[in-house]
Amino acid sequence: LLRSKGITVHVLQDSNQVMDTPDSIFPNNWFVSMEGGRLMLCPMWAPNRRHERLKFLGQLVDLIGHDKLKVSNYGPAHEAQSKFLEGTGAMILDRINMKAYACLSPRCDEDVFKKFCKEFGFKPVAFHGFQTYEGKRAAIYHTNVMMALGEAFAVVCLSAIDDLTERAALVKELQGDGKEIIDVTEDQINNFAGNEIELCNADGKRFTIMTKATYDCLTPEQRAVIEKTSEIISPDVKTIETYGGGSVRCMISEIFL
């Protein structure tokens, strides 16, 4: 589907013959690719997900090229300290304005987040997010549950940020960059409304990838904001969402050369 729109797609092939990696369908958590062949390997909360770095790194190196590759391995040292930063699940990166947005949680450690931002030149914008579960406020563990960025818009569940100072600071950063804010509800993020990604094809045309469940839960007015500047692609991945716990954004990890 993405290839039909002129988007270059590489698939990391898995096999359980070597190591059991049941969550490898979500590669955006274990690495972050930056321009110039720079690659961050991420410290992962779940021990079995740490195998993905070793198992798939060779395929990734082949894509980026040995000559260009510059690796920053954040994995083992931070995992030994129980400090985690699970890639572009934990961080939403605005690569144009060089800002990194993060909902702090056990899977997004503030110290490691700030270290990443300092090394790669991002301005850190951190906050705390919550959603109501069984009548109580529970921490949101990945930022891409509640937030997504396009070049001209930002999808975010502002009501998930209970601290009004943090909420106002986030809005100020987004509006300061000229992004139109699409404020989604907790019910909508339960349908993966924050789990979207905007991609470009070789001609520079922008596409926003979201699940059918997300498309259906957004209002026509919310979709219209996205469609001003980006064509929506909305495949049905209900089985993955139901049994894997993630959606299309988690399944896509950008490659920058």
Task: Give names to the regions the model predicted.
Residues 1-257:
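The feature marks the mature, well-folded catalytic cores of soluble enzymes
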